[in-house]
Amino acid sequence: MADAEAPLTILYFAWLRERTGTSLESVTPPAAVRTVGELVAWLAGRSAGHALAFANLRTVRCAVNQDFAEPATRVGPGDEVAFFPPVTGG
């Protein structure tokens, strides 16, 4: 069980990294932030770059602790949350 005070580790890849201006940040969101969707809304308010990164959520994918996640996926202290563009194969 993670320490209730442990921050979330947020990873940004590709153009999300460029728009937010960072590849990694450690954040402690408000206790009311319990899902990926709530986290995205909170992160979008951190800066203009964050708002731009999350402006079109159809082009953003997420993983929590290296498992693909949906907006309703729960997040909590100590989790690693990664944001990246859709992956394509060929």
Residue positions per predicted region:
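Ubiquitin-like/PB1-type beta-grasp interaction modules and other compact soluble beta-rich domains
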Residues: M1-G89
